[in-house]
């Protein structure tokens, strides 16, 4: 196992807390218009917020990552960094910095999470001497240089499973290739069927992570017993078999900017049949994935674009530019390989 702690920007307002005392002494927290430090409530209770628009505050945050690196953490997960607060939205007129200039929360809100992710990345890079691994909830244009992202607090609902495919494809086309969702849903209670279909549907999402909120049904696969546990294990093993393939696609993305998960219209833009399709996706140019995203469904129609396609599970070949009906029992993800594809295995 590797440990990746969640770190929120909200610093506990506590005169005995070293980080708080340092930040107050150096004037590193965002302020009210009258110059006093702005306070709101988040997970530690009363909390203050680093002014990440200033380079010296980013460096201070980065230096405080050393403790986590020294204790053996494998990465850092930045959360609640819109910034979020428990007692209403942060007012627009709270003073945030934009470099050397004073500005407002209204103007700087969208880049707050970006600057936090950048600071976290630089801290890990400086002290771990390894390729940093950061996850962030809030992001902005360019954050992909510093962090992976996920789509936030979704729900254990079938429409949210359906939403996953266009969300991740759109992120990929926006430069955020390394992205994922909370598999199984974060809020509400997942069912065995929903969790199984979600772990199948997300098989090729770059960030592949089951996550659930406190107070909801536990979502570890063994909680649901069989056959959920065996199916879950099957797809985790399959995921590991595809890691070299996904790694190659990650490298290619750094060169050509094309995402790993892609809408079919990106690869087949002249095909009218795929222009509004949201329940299938491509993995690079080589794989076509057609997940089951409807409750109780054991078959589904799959549209195959131009070319020759091979059923991953049984080797049957199909000509493209047509729709086929495939069997999709609970343990099967409809998956097709483009003919003449070489997959590192």
Task: List each model region and its residues.
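Catalytic-domain carbohydrate-binding cleft regions of carbohydrate-active enzymes
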Residues: 1-343
């Amino acid at each position: 196992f590797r440990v990746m702690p969640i770190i929120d920007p909200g610093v506990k307002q506590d005169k005995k807390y070293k980080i708080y005392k340092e930040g107050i002494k150096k004037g590193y927290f965002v302020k009210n218009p009258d110059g006093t430090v702005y306070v709101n409530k988040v997970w530690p209770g009363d909390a203050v917020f680093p002014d990440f628009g200033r380079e010296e505050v980013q460096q201070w945050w980065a230096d405080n990552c050393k403790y986590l690196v020294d204790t053996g953490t494998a990465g850092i997960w930045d959360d609640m960094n819109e910034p979020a607060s428990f007692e209403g939205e942060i007012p627009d007129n709270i003073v945030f910095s934009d470099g050397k200039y004073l500005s407002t929360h209204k103007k700087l809100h969208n880049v707050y999470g970006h600057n936090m992710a950048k600071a976290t990345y630089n801290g890990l890079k400086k002290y771990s001497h390894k390729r940093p691994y950061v996850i962030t909830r809030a992001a902005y244009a360019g954050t992909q240089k510093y962090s992976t992202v996920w789509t936030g607090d979704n729900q254990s609902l079938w429409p949210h499973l359906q939403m996953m495919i266009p969300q991740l494809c759109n992120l990929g086309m926006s430069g955020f290739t390394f992205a994922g969702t909370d598999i199984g849903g974060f809020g509400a209670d997942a069912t065995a069927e929903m969790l199984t279909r979600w772990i199948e549907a997300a098989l090729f999402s770059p960030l592949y992570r089951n996550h659930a909120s406190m107070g909801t049904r536990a979502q570890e696969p063994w909680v649901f017993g069989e056959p959920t546990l065996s199916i879950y294990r099957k797809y985790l093993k399959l995921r590991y078999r595809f890691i070299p393939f996904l790694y190659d696609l990650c490298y290619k993305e750094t060169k050509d900017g094309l995402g790993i998960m892609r809408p079919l219209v990106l690869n087949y833009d002249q095909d009218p049949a795929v222009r509004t399709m949201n329940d299938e996706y491509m993995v690079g140019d080589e794989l076509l994935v057609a997940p089951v995203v409807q409750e109780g469904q054991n078959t589904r129609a799959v549209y195959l674009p131009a070319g020759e396609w091979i059923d991953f599970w049984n080797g049957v070949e199909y000509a493209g530019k047509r729709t086929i009906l495939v069997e999709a029992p609970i343990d099967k993800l409809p998956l097709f390989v483009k003919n003449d594809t070489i997959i590192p295995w």
